[in-house]
Amino acid sequence: MTEMSEPTIRLATPDDAPALLAIYEPYVLETAITCEYKVPSVEEFAGRIAKTLERYPYLVMEFDGRAVGYAYVSPLNSREAYDWSVETSIYLSRDVRHGGLGRKLHDALKQCLIAMGITNMCALIAVPHDEDDEYLTHNSQDFHAHMGYRLVGAFDRCA
């Protein structure tokens, strides 16, 4: 990626599954943040994208035609009163983190949600109990705090 290039953000399609799964896989295999133990198949991942797109935006960020991140939302709760609240998910390729791209992707997702009348974005994130370790860091917590999220609750010592 060159200094002059700007990322593009577009709506994902199920055809993006292989590229987005390549971004997601290291998070499943090398961290504790996804709460998944097994990497989904490309077919399953494509199905997840399609299911999300039935109701919500699923965005992909590209640099020079290469997917470098994605963001989507899912229902926070199945009850009707929660229809205006969503859970956000955002993933970036490890080689582009900490460069402001997460903010751009998050802001694009937020604008889509505002246009839909969705007023409450929540992030359920895993954080280490004390110090960072090889599987879990405070990066997501710090990012979300920087984006204006605030801690409203914690599940302590649960799996």
Describe each model-derived feature in a short phrase.
Residues T8-L20:
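A short beta-loop-alpha structural element at the N-terminal edge
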Residues L21-R48:
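Conserved GNAT-fold acetyl-CoA-binding loop/helix
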Residues K38-D95, H106-D107, C112, M116:
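Acetyl-CoA-dependent GNAT
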Residues Y72-P75, L124-A126, D132-D133, Q141, ...:
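Conserved catalytic-core motifs of GNAT/GCN5-like acyltransferases
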Residues L113-Y135:
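Conserved GNAT acetyl-CoA-binding A-motif
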